[in-house]
Curated annotation (Swiss-Prot):
Family, as annotated: Belongs to the universal ribosomal protein uL10 family.
Native organism: Listeria welshimeri serovar 6b (strain ATCC 35897 / DSM 20650 / CCUG 15529 / CIP 8149 / NCTC 11857 / SLCC 5334 / V8)
Role description: Forms part of the ribosomal stalk, playing a central role in the interaction of the ribosome with GTP-bound translation factors.
Quaternary organization: Part of the ribosomal stalk of the 50S ribosomal subunit. The N-terminus interacts with L11 and the large rRNA to form the base of the stalk. The C-terminus forms an elongated spine to which L12 dimers bind in a sequential fashion forming a multimeric L10(L12)X complex.
Keywords: Ribonucleoprotein, Ribosomal protein, RNA-binding, rRNA-binding
Keyword RNA-binding tagged: yes
Recorded GO MF terms: large ribosomal subunit rRNA binding; structural constituent of ribosome
GO CC annotations on file: large ribosomal subunit
Name of this protein: Large ribosomal subunit protein uL10
Length: 166
């Protein structure tokens, strides 16, 4: 087998593995961004633990078909880059959406969220959600509210009794 064919097959395997292992994958069109802007975007994504890579569309298409993600083929035209996140589902969508607001040249096309193909609208909706840590802190606040209310009521009763004794 030729070295070129082996390299292409290993690239398809790499994409397949990353697609199946990632919690969130977002495909973007980076046409129109200059080198400085792409470097800035890569740094933001890297700091969040997200891999951002450019693959040939034909190789990506083969990996997408092998993983059974129907509906992504339409997004695989033109110059594309793919952001893979193995841990945080929201982070790639949030970072790319925020970057796209400041840089109109970046266009979010589609993605895969926890094994399901997601449209542009779904990715933008995901980007507006708070991060996992933010959601957990909201949940803690909701769970603490009744306990806090009980503690305040108990303290008020104790203060009232002290006031009556004095």
């Amino acid at each position: 087998m030729s070295k070129v064919l082996e390299a292409k097959q290993s690239a398809v395997e790499e994409i397949k593995t990353k697609l199946s292992a990632s919690a969130s994958t977002v495909i973007v069109d980076y046409r129109g961004l200059n080198v400085g802007e792409i470097t800035e975007l890569r740094k933001q994504l890297r700091d969040a633990g997200i891999e951002f890579k450019v693959y040939k569309n034909s190789l990506t298409r083969r990996a997408v078909e092998a993983n059974g993600y129907e509906g992504l083929e339409g997004a695989l035209t033109g110059p594309n880059a793919i952001a893979f996140s193995n841990e945080d589902v929201v982070a790639p969508a949030k970072i790319l959406n925020d970057f796209a607001k400041d840089h109109e040249a970046l266009e979010i096309k589609a993605g895969v969220i926890e094994g399901k193909v997601a449209s542009l609208e779904e990715i933008k909706a995901l980007a507006t959600l708070p991060s996992r840590e933010g959601l957990l802190s909201m949940l803690c606040n909701v769970l603490q509210a009744p306990v806090r209310g009980l503690a305040i009521a108990t303290k008020a009763v104790a203060d009232q009794k002290e006031g009556q004794e004095a």
